[in-house]
């Protein structure tokens, strides 16, 4: 019975890691989207301050702050069940998702070197999770 409880906790902790990854990716994509929508960074000091304040208090950007906070809460929950050296490599999967989704949503180039890098990241996560 204890084994089943511990196994259930590990499964939940993996879900916490997944939630951390997805919430982090959401925050990054929304932040990029809204910064791009705000336009180019102004030259003048006062214009820069106003630009940053406008982006800072944008509702979508605020949602990215909230999801980043939620991601950190899920991360804390995951770390109650796993060693940091086991859990942390999974966070690198955010690079994979951000690369793919930035290609889809922002039409950023997905080049061969980027694909190779992503494959190496995934291989590293697989190897790291086995050890």
Model-derived regions, located:
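Hydrophobic transmembrane alpha-helices of multi-pass small-molecule transport proteins
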Residues: 113-130
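Hydrophobic residues within alpha-helical transmembrane segments
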Residues: 19, 62, 66, 92-93, ...
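Structural motif at transmembrane-helix junctions in multi-pass transporters
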Residues: 72-93
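Loop-to-transmembrane-helix transition segments
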Residues: 13-19, 50-70
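C-terminal transmembrane-helix exit sites in multi-pass transporters
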Residues: 96-114
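Hydrophobic/aromatic residues within transmembrane alpha-helices
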Residues: 34, 78, 104-106
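Hydrophobic/small/kink-forming positions within alpha-helical transmembrane segments
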Residues: 21, 25, 69, 95-96, ...
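Glycine-/small-residue-enriched transmembrane alpha-helix faces in small-molecule transporters
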Residues: 2-38
